[in-house]
Each structure stands twice: as C-alpha cells, then as structure tokens.
Amino acid sequence: AELVFEDCVVPKENLLGPLGKGFKVAMSSLDVGRLGIAAQALGIAQGAFDQTVDYMKQRKQFGRSLNKFQALAFEMANMKTEIDAARFVLYNAANRRDRGLPSTVEAAQAKLKCSEVASYVVDKAVQFHGGYGYIKDYPVERMYRDQKITEIYEGTSEVMKMVISGDIFK
C-alpha cells in the first residue's frame, strides 16, 4: 500500500516537532527502540543462561552432573562474561540517553552487542540441553526462536555496523 499526500497542510499545533526536523525526530526514536531491543536480547540471553545453569546442575552424564565437565563449565564462564559485557554496553547507552547526550552510536552498539550475545548464548544453551533444547517442554527452545528477531528489527546487525563505522570514519 502507498499513501500520497499532495498539498497537505498540517496545522502548527499538530506538528510533532520543529518544522523540517521530522527525519531527526524519526531517527531519535530509533535510538530508544534499539535500546529496548538490546534489553530484550539481553533478557533472552540471561534467561537462557539461567535455564542452562539449572539444567547442568541436574543433568547427569557418565555418572556426574554436566557442570562438572571442565569444557562445559569454561564455556559457561565465557557466556557469563559476554552477557556482563553486553549489559555494560547497554547500560552505558541508556545512561547517555537518560542524560540527554547523543546516543545514536551507543544505541547501535548496544543493539549489535546484545543481539549477537543472545545469539551465541542461546545457541550454546540449546546445544547444552541436547535434544531437550529443541522441544517445547524447555524454555530455551522458545528463546532460540525469540532471539533471532533481535538481530533484525529496528535495523539489522549490518545496519548497526554501518551506523557505528560511519561514526568512526566521519
């Protein structure tokens, strides 16, 4: 569908912002949306991590719980470190936004980092759950599906990289 407005006049009291600044207002709303998506991705990552910690403590393999296997435990350490790093990136961007500072690049960084961390963590969570991670009886299956959209809407990861690199090379 397409909307066409010809000779359309908007009364001054109905303007959403200063005349001629609509693009800037629209872009500013993207920053807030991207922070929300970053928070969603971070929540998904944290939830998948928490589910996996509980599962690994309970699940026995070769006579011991999964959390006793060093390779798996080390991967969980990496997952936690990535989640914490993503949280700091998100909190920094949100703090800048709250203080009225420019936050377009930081919001893009937060969305990129949090969505990529969610992808990594949820993928490992499903893997560590084995076949159970793929069935609807376990929450990580839903988290696996829910995570993917965080890399797409309000700008794909590639668009976030364009925003960030554009700032680097301006």
What are the roles of these predicted feature ranges?
Residues 2-8, 12, 18-21, 25-170:
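Alpha-helical interface subdomain recognition
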